[in-house]
Regions:
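Conserved, single-site charged/polar hotspot
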Residues: 2-359
Length: 359
């Protein structure tokens, strides 16, 4: 006689109850084991925020014979080359103190820190002009200082890091900056576009659209992080998304993409609801190189793409020729897009660039 079953008439009913209980427990344990065995697969492209010039792309264009002016015109649409005001001093926050550095001296200490000195001269010259322009337009610290000496703005390592080739690129472009409508145009840059750059309003949500910072195809960007992938167990994914998952983790649903198409917004799916997140927060939580990413789930039944409601991809604007150099100094910075400060949520910056890219 089964314990708790006091009569023959109740024996069958009791056995059924126990069988049902055992079945429920077994199914629950199986479901838990299945969830823990599921894997979140992430396939992505690029390294950085994707807005403006890709350093690996500039390298590729230079290797294909493009001039620095053509490279800059490709990434910063409708721009021209102008001349910076004379005797410009860049205010750099060094520790707790602000140091004033002459513009050309500052740029020499940046270019050698941002890209490899072995790159073709056109790529180094494009970097020099972009970095010089960024120094004039960033205003990271308001009126107190202009730039940080690191990836929050752009890398600056000073005279000790200078090289003959990068100094030659700075000298060859002395005073030259990127302008739009006769004013300095903020020149964001980063390591690798993944094959397409991003429009500023999608790369930095909350920023106003700018006509020179639009997404363009980038076929000559062939850096080491043009394509990458990551896999995480569901338990590891949930741990990284701590505070965002309601109930048990079920996956990611992308709601909106930019033109590249980097993620603008997505939902973290849980058994008890969903949580809206930005693409940059999602990249930061997972430690991704870029917000250009696609998600799928692999389990015992196979691999399943995550549900997605994506923005339509837009065709890139037509290529534009390099603009002529103007000899007159230009005035205040154009546009209204402030330089976003701090990290981008990936191992790169949101200001200028996130360190030297391999190539």
């Amino acid at each position: 006689m089964l314990g708790g079953c006091s009569s023959d008439s109740g024996l069958m009913e009791c056995a059924i109850r126990r069988f049902t209980l055992i079945t429920v427990v077994a199914v629950s344990l199986w479901a838990t084991a299945t969830a823990s065995a599921s894997t979140l697969l992430i396939v992505g492209a690029g390294d950085g925020h994707g807005v403006g010039m890709s350093q690996d792309g500039a390298l590729g264009y230079a290797e294909h014979g493009w001039s620095y002016g053509a490279i800059l015109s490709h990434y910063y649409r409708g721009t021209a080359i102008g001349v910076a005001p004379e005797h410009t001093v860049v205010k750099v926050l060094m520790g707790s103190k602000v140091k004033g550095i002459a513009l050309e001296t500052y740029v020499r200490g940046v270019v050698s820190a941002e890209v490899s000195s072995s790159w073709p001269m056109a790529a180094l010259e494009a970097q020099a002009v972009a970095s010089r322009t960024y120094a004039l337009t960033a205003h990271a610290g308001g009126s107190r200082f202009d730039v940080y000496p690191d990836t929050r703005s752009q890398m600056y390592l000073g005279k000790a890091a200078e090289t003959p080739s990068t100094n030659a690129a700075v000298a060859a472009t002395t005073g030259q900056i990127v302008t739009y409508g006769g004013k300095p145009a903020i020149t964001y840059f980063y390591a690798d576009s993944g094959g397409h750059t991003e429009s500023v309003q999608y790369g930095f949500p909350g920023s106003s659209p700018q006509p020179w910072l639009v997404g363009v195809a980038d076929p000559y960007d062939n850096g080491p992080l043009r394509k990458w992938s990551v896999s995480l167990s569901f338990s590891a994914a949930r741990a990284k998304l701590n505070g965002l998952v309601k109930g048990s983790f079920k996956g990611i649903e992308v709601l909106k993409r930019g033109s590249s198409p980097r993620i603008v917004t997505a939902d973290v799916l849980g058994s008890k609801g969903r949580t809206l997140v930005s693409g940059s927060e999602l990249a930061a939580r997972f430690g991704l190189y870029d917000t250009w990413a696609y998600f799928s789930v692999r389990d015992s039944h196979g691999t399943h793409p995550e549900p997605e409601v994506g923005a339509k991809k837009t065709s890139p604007p037509p290529a534009q020729p390099a603009q002529a150099i103007s000899s007159a100094p230009v005035g205040a910075a154009g546009g209204s897009a402030a330089a976003p400060e701090g990290g981008s949520g990936a191992p790169t910056n949101v200001g200028g660039q996130g360190g030297v890219s391999a190539g």
